[in-house]
Amino acid sequence: MTGNHEIYLGAERALAVARRAGIRVLEDEMTVIDGLQIVGVGYPRRGEPKDNAAAVRGIAGFDPGRPSILLYHSPVQIPEVKAAGVRLQISGHTHHGQIFPVGWLTRLIYGRYYRGLNEEDGIAVYTSPGTGAWGPAMRTGNTPEVTVIRLKPR
């Protein structure tokens, strides 16, 4: 799914590059693997807000009663996507602040969802700080990571 940087570069161009490289892009669509619904919701174009819960509910074949993961660039609209049937959201966007002291700002904006795994009332949200940088090619005062998530049936 797209994020803000793909929008900055030109979403269609970025999507075409990914697809030419053989990457399956879930842009407001879903795939099902062993009964697990994996939903990708693309970042809003031209800065207009996006209703992620409506996007999830509008995806053909989405069943709120089945296990599901939402891939969305920013850790936002958590109660709404939970109400739509999502049980795990995986996001990024915050870069964990990237350069000290910006981490304080991301914590202020995204609250407890600014980094790591947070579980609340039937939904888990994982926000990856990522490994890269935006703007200056540097990271200070935070720890980049490559995340491995192992899912186990309940």
Which positions does each model-derived feature cover?
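Soluble catalytic domains of enzymes that build or remodel membrane lipids, polysaccharides, and related
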Residues: M1-R154
